[in-house]
Amino acid sequence: MPLAEIHAIRYIRASILTLLLCLALVPLGMQAQRLFTVVIDAGHGGKDSGTVGNGGKEKDITLAVAKLVGSKIRAAHPEVRVLYTRSTDVFVGLQARADFANKQKASLMLSIHVNSAPSKDVHGTETYVLGIAKFANNLSVAMRENKAMLLESNYKTTYKGFDPTSTESYIMFDLMQDAYFNKSIELANKIQRQYRSAGRYSRGVRQDILWVLSQSAMPSILTEIGFLSNANEASFMLSEAGQQSLASAIA
């Protein structure tokens, strides 16, 4: 990884926008070698609605927030390249999302999702990095988010026999050592702190086996911005003010 990117991520202060300010400290010649690129991944889309409830669909909320995050980064740092895995209501496979970020040589990947729980009382934000699922509720998140691969006609070939609904698949999953783990953890912690500053309840940073993170060759996180199963949070996420607040916390 170029020194410019390592320097930027290591000295992140309060948010991603603050992180990007660090680019100004790097010599222009070094910056020119590789443009700092942020890929923003709006979860689900098209035939994959994601979680649904309280009058909202995950795919619509994630797209709206993703666009706001990108706009805020561009406004504050026009020198940064901002790309989206999807900018409309279309279906994009999990592997295709990671492949896009890798092909674009992204410096960071931010995957935005909406949570759900059987209990309507569960609420809050949480941000995931690639790691071993230590608790049953963590594994349920991985199964839910990875299940989108089943909507792809050739998923058995694309994902090499990985079954997102099978506990055994996760047990046998070859994690290897994630070279970007520490940077991803640092970024996830910063985002959760920003959520708290915005008045949102933080459920903390968690590790899980999420396909889009496992296939991304850069620091990457998946953030769950709230529970659509909770009426109050659903109302907040569906409102323009709520989406602006959440986007500011991520950006």
Regions found by a protein language model. Name each.
Residues P2-L3, D178:
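Generic amphipathic alpha-helical segments used as scaffolds and interaction surfaces in large
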Residues L3-I6, P27, A32:
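Von Willebrand factor
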Residues L3-L17:
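Bacterial N-terminal signal peptides that target proteins for export
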Residues S15-P27:
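Bacterial N-terminal signal peptides
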Residues Q31-R34, S216-M218:
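Short, flexible loop/turn motifs enriched in small residues
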Residues A32-F162, Q177-N189, Q244:
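Catalytic-core regions of hydrolytic enzymes
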Residues E168-A251:
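Active-site-adjacent mobile loop/cap segments within catalytic or ligand-binding domains
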